[in-house]
UniProtKB/Swiss-Prot annotation:
Protein name: Pyruvoyl-dependent arginine decarboxylase
Cofactor(s) annotated in UniProt: pyruvate
Catalytic activity line of the entry: L-arginine + H(+) = agmatine + CO2
A molecular function GO annotation: arginine decarboxylase activity
EC number: 4.1.1.19
Positions bearing Pyruvic acid (Ser): S39
Organism: Halobacterium salinarum (strain ATCC 700922 / JCM 11081 / NRC-1) (Halobacterium halobium)
Gene: pdaD
Record-stated family: Belongs to the PdaD family.
GO biological process, one term: arginine catabolic process
EC class name: lyase
Gene3D superfamilies: Pyruvoyl-Dependent Histidine Decarboxylase, subunit B
Keywords: Decarboxylase, Lyase, Pyruvate
Superkingdom per UniProt: Archaea
Amino acid sequence: MPRIRIAWGSGVAPTEMAAYDAALADANVHNYNLIRVSSVIPADATVSPVDTAPDLGPAGNTLTVVEARGQTAGPGQASAGLAWAPRDGAPGLFYEAADETTPDDVADRVTTGITAGMDVRDWDGVEPSVRTETVTADAGEHAAAVVIAAYGDSDPVFDQ
């Protein structure tokens, strides 16, 4: 059965991109070329929160993800949130939100969003799971928070 792992992280650095890279490193997905997809969970997949992703293959490979990414330039706070609602034997859904706000705000937004997304699809309600990550930056710093749903293992960029 294919596995989707939920990993999260945060980072503070002198530039916006360096903070994002640090957040990806904290989640252990920093050595992959991320391919972002929309929010449908395949019917045969399992979803597992793991905190930090395990080794998913060689550096430089592609990794398919749904990503919530919040960033701020200090002083400030950024939060990212991901909700998921898998359904037994049927497709499920992810919803993501991120902003310069509180973790409670992003949790409310992803919960409201995923409920609406399930309604749009006429899918039976499943109580969603939610994970948030928050980070604070001081003046002169940049900060990033990510919550990543990583689909399976990584794949080579080039055909062999």
